[in-house]
A protein has these predicted regions:
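Short, cysteine/histidine-rich loop/knuckle motifs that typically chelate Zn2+
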Residues: 7-8, 32-33, 397
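Residues immediately within or flanking Cys/His clusters that coordinate Zn2+
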Residues: 3, 10, 28, 395
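Active-site-facing alpha/beta catalytic cores
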Residues: 143, 150, 155-273, 277-300
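Glycine-rich phosphate/ribose-binding loops and adjacent secondary-structure elements
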Residues: 258-410
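Gly/Ser/Thr/Ala-enriched C-terminal appendages of enzymes
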Residues: 359-364, 368-469
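Conserved, well-structured core domains of diverse proteins
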Residues: 47-146, 150, 155-166, 174, ...
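Short, non-ligating residues that shape and space the ligands of small metal-coordination modules
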Residues: 12-16, 39-43
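Short linker/helix segments within small regulatory modules
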Residues: 18-28
Length: 469
């Protein structure tokens, strides 16, 4: 009796527990979770290596030496990837963040107030209201410092975008459009909406710019910095094609940079133009954490109202695995460096937003204490909506209907139920942020500071202002 595993959703077909052997299953049989065919299954790692030939892709060379194939090696950890490259001749594409461990927020601890500073009682009110772009004519005001990051309609289903918009609205926080343009129903359902301005300039009209609450110019993201976006043809529905001005069923490629932004003067002209066209809404910029100080100096020259730094390990809908694994400054260090350069430049009216791998209220509290004004969350918001981390976003076969355009899979997602889950998540973490403020003796979550933190990691204490325990 053997076990066969779906390479997309990791479902296991165990012959021991089934009434039909794998070989006896009809050719049209599909995975009960994600709907993939038999060709997407391979022998599970728990089987003996010589159990059978394993087929993934016709003509891929998968059958060659299959009798002796081993799924992995404890010492040569890249063996499976090398075999895959050798068989396909193509780079491995993966969603979500890198699996390689990075510096953890768990290495940072919050110091509770005792005598030197008194904690606050549960009954004492705590301010969570958050101001982004205070120097703008119309600053963005949220009731919590945590909001939904940029994830496009295309990477996500219509239902997922609506659930995130409705859920964030119930919590009186913002949702971002993502790089795929504006889904009108998502904008209408939102409480506050941040539009992502990208090289392909989807949805960039004077009417739309007047409707949104802020605009963020996307320069890069940590999981694939310096690379453009790619939406596979299988995800390009007629509706997505209409929003993006493309053809249905064809791959959509986003450029790696803006063709009309080649200098800091060009960036300044773009910021000025967007500020005028929005009527004075906050204009920001999103940067992958790399040349942090130099990039921030250019952003400040351009006159932005807020800067988003995306650190390692930020997520993505799809990225070359090798790029995701090898790039970007870890979020903790990126935040410390960004705060330092902004302070040294006297940029106290420029809001700092951090994103990339933050999940829980304790992560958020630590980021606020390190100098972030707000936190954008993508994966955490998706999980709140119902994501089960199958990590197959790039295939379009998400079993829970979030990262797919398949009508049958999308039908599994109940917009209102997922919206309530998202709202509950934001409300819960906001209340937990109040608790962290109280236990550190602060009546405002934005008053959390470095004095409230310490670290058990000497690398962090050596390269950030955080003191070691």
């Amino acid at each position: 009796m053997a076990k066969w595993q779906c390479e997309l959703c990791l479902y296991i077909y165990d012959e021991l527990n089934e009434s039909v052997t794998w070989e006896a299953l009809p050719k049209e049989w599909t995975c009960p979770v994600c709907g993939s065919g038999k060709e997407s299954f391979s022998l599970a790692a728990s089987n003996p290596p010589a159990a059978a030939s394993i087929g993934v892709e016709t003509g891929s060379g998968e059958e060659y030496l299959a009798e002796w194939r081993r799924p992995a090696d404890d010492f040569e950890v890249n063996m499976a990837d090398i075999h895959r490259l050798a068989m396909t001749g193509k780079s491995i594409i993966e969603p979500m963040r890198t699996r390689i461990p990075t510096f953890s927020w768990d290495d940072i601890l919050i110091k509770g107030a005792q005598l030197a500073k008194m904690p606050l009682n549960k009954t004492e009110p705590i301010v969570t209201q958050t101001l982004i772009g205070p120097a703008a004519a119309f600053p963005l005001i949220l009731e919590t410092p945590v909001f939904v990051s940029h994830i496009s309609f295309g990477a996500l289903s219509r239902e997922a975008k609506l659930a995130l918009a409705k859920g964030s609205a119930l919590a009186k926080t913002a949702i971002c459009s993502g790089e795929g343009g504006i889904l009108p129903e998502s904008l209408a359902a939102s409480w506050r909406y941040i539009f992502e301005y990208v090289p392909n300039k989807y949805s960039v009209t004077d009417e739309n710019l007047k409707l949104v609450d802020a605009v963020e110019i996307k320069i890069g993201q940590s999981a694939k910095p310096g690379m453009g976006g790619h939406l596979p043809a299988s995800k390009v529905t007629s509706e997505i094609a209409a929003i993006r001005g493309c053809r249905e069923g064809e791959d959509i490629i986003s450029p790696a940079h803006f063709p009309d932004i080649r200098s800091k003067e060009d960036l300044k002209a773009t910021v000025t133009d967007l500020r005028l066209r929005t009527g004075g809404k906050p204009i920001g910029i999103k940067l992958a954490a790399g040349h942090i100080e130099e990039d921030i100096d250019i952003a400040l020259y351009a006159g932005v109202d807020f800067i988003t730094i995306d650190g390692r390990a930020g997520g993505t809908g799809a990225s070359p695995k090798v790029v995701k694994n090898a790039t970007s400054v870890p979020t903790i260090f990126a935040l410390a460096r960004a705060r330092k350069i902004l302070d040294s430049r006297g940029a106290d009216t420029v809001s700092l937003i951090i994103t990339g791998g933050l999940r829980t209220s304790s992560d958020f509290a630590k980021a606020l204490a390190m100098g972030a004004d707000a936190i954008a969350v993508g994966t955490a918001a998706m999980i709140a909506a119902g994501c089960q981390q199958y990590r197959i976003c790039n295939t379009g076969k998400c079993p829970v209907g979030i990262a797919t355009q398949d009508p049958a899979l999308r039908a599994r997602l109940d917009v209102d139920k997922s919206a309530l889950r998202v709202a509950n998540f934001f409300k819960a973490v906001t209340e937990e942020l109040r608790d962290f403020a109280r236990l550190t003796g602060n009546d405002n979550v934005h008053h959390l500071s470095l004095a409230d933190l310490c670290t058990t990691n000497s690398e962090i204490s050596s390269h950030t202002p955080l003191e070691h325990v």
